[in-house]
């Protein structure tokens, strides 16, 4: 299985976690997912009244230096860690 296929598998698998990840973990996953699928941030930062979108944008911006492949690998690792923490794999 190639990296892209494994990434896509884990992007689906994360939806089956027994408990919802923390907000911090969700933001990490969001940033890595966007970096892996879109690449570097290509939008302007949302305004101060849209906090949710601003946090998501910041999470994406935080991983901007990673290649798509690095982001995919980190995403897979994070999903595996979340399943281990939840006690199921």
Curated annotation (Swiss-Prot):
The keyword Transport applies. It comes from the Eukaryota. Keywords: Lipid-binding, Transport. It holds the Pfam family ACBP. Gene3D superfamilies: 1.20.80.10. An acyl-CoA binds at residues 30-34, 56, 75. PROSITE patterns: ACB_1, ACB_2. Disulfide bonds: none annotated. GO terms for biological process: fatty acid metabolic process. GO terms for molecular function: fatty-acyl-CoA binding. Residues 3-88 form the ACB domain. The keyword Transport applies. InterPro entries: Acyl-CoA-binding_prot_CS, Acyl-CoA-binding_protein, Acyl-CoA-binding_sf, FERM/acyl-CoA-bd_prot_sf. Binds medium- and long-chain acyl-CoA esters with very high affinity and may function as an intracellular carrier of acyl-CoA esters. Belongs to the ACBP family. This is Acyl-CoA-binding protein. It comes from Gossypium hirsutum (Upland cotton).
């Amino acid at each position: 299985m190639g990296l892209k296929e494994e990434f896509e598998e884990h992007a689906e698998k994360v939806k089956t976690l027994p408990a919802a990840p923390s907000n911090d973990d969700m933001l990490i996953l969001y940033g890595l997912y966007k970096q892996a699928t879109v690449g570097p941030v290509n939008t302007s930062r949302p305004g101060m009244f849209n906090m949710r979108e601003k946090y998501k944008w910041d999470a994406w911006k935080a991983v901007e230096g990673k290649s798509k492949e690095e982001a995919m690998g980190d995403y897979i690792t994070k999903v595996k860690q979340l399943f281990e923490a939840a006690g199921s794999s």
